[in-house]
Amino acid sequence: MTDTPPPSPIAATGAIATPPFEGPLADARDQRFMRAALEEARLAEAAGEVPVGAVVVWNDAIIARGHNLPIRSRDPSAHAEMQALRAAAQVIGNYRMPECELYVTLEPCAMCSGAMLHARLRHVVFGATDPKTGAAGSVLDLFAEARLNHQTTIRGGVLADECGQLLRDFFRARRRAQKADRAGGQAVTEPGNGSVTEPSSDPQGKPDA
């Protein structure tokens, strides 16, 4: 489900590489859209997926939503950001989105960061950092790579505690369930373990090695 999109289509070129808002109004606005991304993250959690959610915003309206689905879809590319970008491209009729912003509850990985740059997003906002696979400053910073032909501005740490706590609670519950299974002599087959502070190589769904 999406909010009512703006009436006119987005141009294919003319990316804007400056933050759309600054100051206290930006904080309130970013929190509003991050809370929408958190709603998506909770949908992922309810489906047994690692709780990461994303929304795409255009002209102050949410035009697309997505949450983590790699386990159920058996698709390693089905991260929340990719789901939201695919949905947004269908809404606007173009894979280029230079007037759009993306909000995601976890720092994007290299795959998702690359897709955002290919889409020529105007601005990206994330919640919790990912010290193992984050590609917006934690492990590497694709958004600061001046050799790329497009630069997307990025801001992190919006509702970071809330976004991070959702992930920590999820993995804590999963570890308890795994211990209970082992105590009962049952093999644990469900993939996707890790945490924000101690993540696996892919906190969005890849099994631990």
Task: Please name every model-derived segment.
Residues 37, 41-44, 54, 64, ...:
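Small-residue (primarily alanine) positions within well-ordered alpha-helices
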